[in-house]
Amino acid sequence: MDIIIRPTRKSDYNQLLEVEIAATPGLSYLPNVFDKFLHDITGHFLTAEVGGKVVGCGKFSMMIDGSAWLETLRVLPEFQGIGVGKAFYDEFLRL
């Protein structure tokens, strides 16, 4: 199963809301930060796909002191445990 990590697009919004609802029930964070994350030049807002299906998102930012901050990481429950989170981390480290 190939995991594709790519930049998030505005058109991913509805699918990523579904990811957030499934992955973190009762937490509504993404609607408040989606546009900010898309335009944040200090970080990377990425989306994971498996078989053409959006299965997760992650936001990684570099801090002034050189440290990094993983602001959010969401993966659909049925895709947890197959390496999606690791794929995000690997891509963040590459960036």
Give, region by region, the residue ranges found by the protein language model.
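Short amphipathic alpha-helix that is part of the acyltransferase structural core
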Residues: 1-32
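N-terminal "mature head" segments of proteins
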Residues: 2, 45-47
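Short loop/turn motifs at secondary-structure junctions and domain boundaries
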Residues: 36-41
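Conserved beta-strand in the GNAT
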Residues: 47, 53-61, 69-74
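Conserved acetyl-CoA-binding loop-helix of GNAT-fold acetyltransferases
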Residues: 75-77, 81-95
